[in-house]
Swiss-Prot record:
This is Peptide deformylase 1. The keyword Protein biosynthesis applies. GO terms for molecular function: metal ion binding; peptide deformylase activity. Belongs to the polypeptide deformylase family. GO terms for biological process: co-translational protein modification; translation. SUPFAM superfamilies: Peptide deformylase. Its cofactor is Fe(2+). The lineage of its organism: Bacteria, Bacillati, Bacillota, Bacilli, Bacillales.
Length: 156
């Protein structure tokens, strides 16, 4: 496994919709492993492929709960319910945090590393993290959804 360079904003790859994955091969498995390692070392809870310079619909999420590591390939949100408002940051925007409104519950359809389709339901912080990463895959940055930015001392 290797630690990948995290792309910082501004960079065109972060604002470009990603291609769907069609090849479920060893290259994809390596990308998933490297992304997860990179995310953990950077102390993140999610990482999308464009954040490491790869324009594919691939994301990893690990909010350090009982769910563990989630690999999302070609994900789409089928259902949203409720509302939550809270702080978000992004590994591509070091030191920047803002208040973002997200659905409190989501149902997602995605594929695993072998191409098998699965459904996932999430709520609370996990739902927030998944929505943030899926946005990345469509070239949408959290800064476009921020209602207000936090000062550094507000999140201590």
């Amino acid at each position: 496994m290797a630690v990948l360079e995290i792309i910082k904003h501004p960079n065109e790859v972060l604002e470009t919709p990603c291609e769907r994955v069609i090849n479920f091969d060893k290259k994809l498995v390596k990308l998933l492993k490297d992304m997860h390692e990179t995310m953990l070392i950077a102390d993140g809870v999610g990482l999308a492929a464009p954040q490491v310079g790869v324009s594919l619909q691939v994301a990893v999420v690990d909010v350090d709960d009982d769910t563990g590591k989630i690999e999302l390939i070609n994900p789409s949100i089928l259902e949203k319910r409720g509302e939550q408002v809270g702080p978000e940051g992004c590994l591509s925007f070091p030191g920047l945090y803002g208040e973002v409104e997200r659905a409190d519950y989501i149902k997602v359809r995605a594929q695993n590393r072998r191409g098998k389709v699965f459904l996932l339901e999430a709520e609370g912080f996990l739902a927030r993290a998944i929505q943030h990463e899926i946005d990345h895959l469509h070239g949408v940055l959290f800064t476009s959804k921020v209602t207000r930015y936090y000062e550094e001392n507000e999140l201590e």
